[in-house]
Design a protein with these regions (language model features):
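Short amphipathic alpha-helix with an adjacent loop that forms part of the alpha/beta core around
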Residues: 2-10, 29
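Hydrophobic alpha-helix-in-membranes signature
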Residues: 10, 43, 162-164
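Donor/substrate-binding cores of folate-linked one-carbon enzymes
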Residues: 13-132
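Residues within well-ordered alpha-helical secondary structure of globular protein domains
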Residues: 8-9, 102, 158
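Internal anion-binding site segments
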Residues: 127-188
Length: 188
């Protein structure tokens, strides 16, 4: 059996963070307390593999982490706990990732015993509030300068430093990691 190694460990619970893939039902069924995940958004917003990037690209002013039940459907399980944080103009993917990583670790430490004791009551996600944050494609790394300055600014921040937004200049690919919005500009 492909899950024999996990079965032999006899886990009470399986915890994942930033896994970004479907977990097979056979694995979800192993631990008696189920499987839980730390997801880097305030679910049901931004289900999927790139919630941090999309929270910045889409211009959110806040995001957070959600402790959630893992089920067969991606990021759709019951929510057990959440913590939020502000997104500022100084945030990039890297800075927000690091802050959410710390918040997620704290959320697990504060809630794991309660979860294992059955004292956390999960809240179903409102399917009418669901948005999706798919993985970033190569095409989405390319900047579109026909968009507003705010949209380009957010796009650069959301992809900085990995994978980095890019544009073509003199037939060369240029990576953009930082930008600044200039409110008014004149050549004269």
């Amino acid at each position: 059996d492909e899950y024999e190694f996990i079965k032999e460990l006899n886990p009470d619970v399986i915890i994942t963070c930033a896994y970004g893939q479907f977990v097979p039902q056979g694995l979800l069924d192993i631990p008696p307390h189920g499987c839980i995940n730390i997801h880097a958004s305030l679910l049901p917003k931004l289900r999927g593999g790139a919630p941090i990037q999309h929270s910045i690209i889409d211009g959110f002013d806040k995001t957070g982490v959600t402790l959630m039940e893992m089920i067969k459907k991606m990021d759709a399980g019951r929510m057990y706990a959440k913590v939020e944080t502000e997104i500022t103009d100084d945030d990039t993917y890297d800075s927000l990732h690091d802050r959410l990583k710390e918040l997620g670790a704290k959320l697990i430490l504060e809630n794991l015993d309660l979860y294992l004791e059955g004292k956390l009551i999960g809240e179903e996600q409102d399917e009418n509030e669901v948005t999706i944050s798919p993985n970033i494609s190569k095409e989405e790394e390319h900047l579109d300068f026909s968009k507003t300055s705010r949209e380009v600014f957010n796009h650069i921040r959301g992809l900085s430093s990995i994978p980095g937004a890019n544009f073509i200049y003199n037939n060369e690919v240029v990576k953009a990691y930082r930008s600044k919005i200039i409110e008014s500009f004149s050549l004269y």
